[in-house]
């Protein structure tokens, strides 16, 4: 069927190989934007808009990718410009996400296709003239018209409370000019793989009959376990939008790490199966750093949930204190041989899982993960929407990690983790959460 998800089709492995080839050609994210500190706010805007319009995760992740890399190349200096670019990225990304299922193979879309997006003001009469459209793309564009009801209209976007509360209204003329600018900035190639494009394919092998829970007994119901793991994986997938540090990894690595982190949280053994290694071509060692970052965020949210519950109960008079309940009980692990000062930091089930997970790695990892930060020289006035200079960004000598998660209900934690949380060789700088 034409609407069959690609990961369930007969050419799933071929599509996966094509996506893996395309991700190798993705540009490097330099974190040079002078408005990088506003990134999380606009990611939240895109998330809420996509949820309001019921867009798929692939559209949301592609929209954030387009916004990040456009900000990385151009001096978007005003909030009006950033709102306009964000909405345009969402509409363009949704158009591409609707085209992809019709082609059944993401690699079939030409890098120079003339996109005519229903619901937007992009039209062939006013658009620049790219190279000729391949026959399969032209055929698909015609079939795309009957899905116009799935594309949010500009009036629908403007009427949302998210934008109206900011006194923001986007005109068709502004949308047209911004769409054309985005298409030219990406050389008319919007078919870019994101972690959302890989996740469902890896979820096919996420649970098996051979899995054990808590290292002791087999899972009694693989179907329910897989459903629960899918919820975890999609949660971790949304977590990756919150920080540009995940651009340090290839999209397929991030997607596989979401599955790996989910298996760790559900205490499925082994943490990474042979089927997952075969389908993704990644070993646990390849995913270790990315998984650790995701587990730190997960631990943050657990602590926040316990704190919120305690505060709510404290406001009710006559309510006796209740013991803290966790989603699962930590299994009994053998001694890990860690220093006492390091073990003292691990007091929650998730932290115990992190230790056990780290101990399960066979090869010692070397090197550290460094994320770019904006220097003071990048905060000088700029001309609107001009390409950024290719200047190096200084990295501070002492770095720490500030993680915060926005969700509904919104959690606004800002917890500092030193490099000793997992090992002395990893430091995760993330400065984009400063409001």
Swiss-Prot record:
Keywords: Cyclin. Belongs to the cyclin family. Cyclin J subfamily. One of its GO terms (cellular component) is cytoplasm. GO terms for molecular function: cyclin-dependent protein serine/threonine kinase regulator activity. Residues 120-142 are annotated as: Disordered. The gene is CCNJL. InterPro entries: Cyclin, Cyclin-like_dom, Cyclin-like_sf, Cyclin_C-dom, Cyclin_N. Residues 14-191 form the Cyclin N-terminal domain. This is Cyclin-J-like protein. It holds the Pfam family Cyclin_C. SUPFAM superfamilies: Cyclin-like (SSF47954). It comes from the Eukaryota. It comes from Homo sapiens (Human).
């Amino acid at each position: 069927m034409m609407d069959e998800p690609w990961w369930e089709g007969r050419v799933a492995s071929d599509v996966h190989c094509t996506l893996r080839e395309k991700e190798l050609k993705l540009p490097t994210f330099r974190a040079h934007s002078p408005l990088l500190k506003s990134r999380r706010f606009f990611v939240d805007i895109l998330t809420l808009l996509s949820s309001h319009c019921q867009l798929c995760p692939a559209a949301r992740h592609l929209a954030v990718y387009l916004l990040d890399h456009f900000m990385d190349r151009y001096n978007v200096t005003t909030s009006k410009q950033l709102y306009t670019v964000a909405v345009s990225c969402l509409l363009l990304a949704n158009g591409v996400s609707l085209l992809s299922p019709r082609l059944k193979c993401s690699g079939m879309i030409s890098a120079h296709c003339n996109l005519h997006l229903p619901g937007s003001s992009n039209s062939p009469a006013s658009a620049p003239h790219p190279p000729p459209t391949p026959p399969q793309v032209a055929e698909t564009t015609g079939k795309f018209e009957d899905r116009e009801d799935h594309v949010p209209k500009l009036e629908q976007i403007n009427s949302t409370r998210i934008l109206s509360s900011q006194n923001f209204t986007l005109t068709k003329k502004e949308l047209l000019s911004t769409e054309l600018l985005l298409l030219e900035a990406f050389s008319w190639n919007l078919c870019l793989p994101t972690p959302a494009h890989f996740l469902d394919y890896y979820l096919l092998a996420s649970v098996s009959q051979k899995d054990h829970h808590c290292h002791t007994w087999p899972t009694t119901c693989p179907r329910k376990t897989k459903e629960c793991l899918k919820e975890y994986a999609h949660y971790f997938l949304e977590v990756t939008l919150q920080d540009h540090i995940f651009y340090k990894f290839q999209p397929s690595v991030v997607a596989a790490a979401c599955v790996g982190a989910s298996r760790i949280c559900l205490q499925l053994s082994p943490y990474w199966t042979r089927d997952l290694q075969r389908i993704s071509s990644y070993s646990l060692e390849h995913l270790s750093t990315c998984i650790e970052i995701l587990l730190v965020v997960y631990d943050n949210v657990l602590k926040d949930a316990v704190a919120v519950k305690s505060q709510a109960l404290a406001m009710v008079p006559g309510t006796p204190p209740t013991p803290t309940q966790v989603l699962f009980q930590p299994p009994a692990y053998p001694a890990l041989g860690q220093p006492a000062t390091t073990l003292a930091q691990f007091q929650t089930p998730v932290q115990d899982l992190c230790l056990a997970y780290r101990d399960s790695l066979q090869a010692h990892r070397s090197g550290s993960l460094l994320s770019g930060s904006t220097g003071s020289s990048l905060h000088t006035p700029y001309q609107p929407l001009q390409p950024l200079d290719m200047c190096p960004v200084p990295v501070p000598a002492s770095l720490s990690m500030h993680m915060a998660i926005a969700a509904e209900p919104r959690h606004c934690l800002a917890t500092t983790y030193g490099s000793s949380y997992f090992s002395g060789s990893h430091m995760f700088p993330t400065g984009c959460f400063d409001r």
